[in-house]
Amino acid sequence: MLHLIASLKNLMMKNYHGLVLVLVIVLASGAAQEALGAAAVKQRTFSSPEEGVRALVDAAKSNDTKELLNILGPEAKSLIESGDPVSDRATRERFVTSYYEEANKLVKSGDSKMVLQTGKDDWPFPIPLVKENDRWRFDTSAGKEEIINRRIGRNELDVIQVCLAIVDAEREYYQRDPDGDSLLQYAQKFISTKGKRDGLYWETKPDEQPSPLGPLVARARGEGYKGAGGKPIPYHGYYYKLLTGQGKDASGGAYDYLVRGKMMGGFGMVAYPAQYGSSGIMTFIVNHDGVVYQKDLGAKTASVAQSMTKFNPDKTWTPVKQ
């Protein structure tokens, strides 16, 4: 349990440089996302780069998503969804408190371009300010690819740790026998049936031992936990699905993990991006041995991953360095 808690805590505390950029362009809720899609927005311009930066930081502080879109322009619409609104909100706050307020400066890059650098490491904000007709604006299109690449990199690093945390959770579940039937088995689902402990997560009272898995990870299961907007909620931009068997390319050969309806022979899992090319590229698989593999499943990632029932890391899957 301690390893699991530490793994998830580390995910929340990591300050990857690539995390910072998302804070100013992601939305806090599904309702805000719908509002942003309404009408074309004319981008705001500024009399100086300093004025532009102040406006950006003020909008981030106040979580004013409408003003952020005005500042960054219509190009920002396609960058708004990172796949995890909870993480996005925390990242946005961290940009202001841990980076901008720690240190900030504008660095000249040519006669008509300025780049905002923040934090003690002078992290460059990926969207530069450019001068046009004696006015300054954020050139979102110039930073678009970099933003997506950094988001994907951050998510994929986090998801590898989530995979290992789920392995820990399954092992703990097996040892604890939480359903009390005296049969040591792994959980077949992430969220328990109401009133039962047949999944990796269940609600507990303050004086009770926590369930092996936290609610945020559990609700990102592939079959689709429905949030307030009626859509599944990813965790670090990914969905997760448990597998009930393994194929011939897995260690030990092909066999089912289920024995008379109980998952006693092992467990497997697949993690795939909620939005291929935006929240992630790689799909990850892992089983009870704890070795994570990755593969780019291409444009049909979601349908391929959703149809998976067995853990089968053939030669097209690559082990992840852990």
Regions inferred by a protein language model and the residue ranges of each:
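Bacterial N-terminal signal peptides
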Residues: V20-G30
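Short, well-ordered alpha-helical segments enriched in acidic and aromatic residues
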Residues: D64-A76, Q185-A187
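Short beta-strand edge/turn micro-motifs at domain boundaries
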Residues: K113-L157, Q161-L164, V291-K295
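C-terminal soluble interaction/assembly domains
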Residues: G265-Q322
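N-terminal secretory signal peptides that target proteins for export/translocation
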Residues: M1-N15
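Short, low-complexity N-terminal intrinsically disordered segments enriched in polar/charged residues
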Residues: L36-S62, G143-D168, E172
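Surface-exposed, charged secondary-structure patches
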Residues: A76-F125, G229, I233-P234, Q246-K248, ...
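Flexible, glycine-rich surface segments
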Residues: Y173-S278
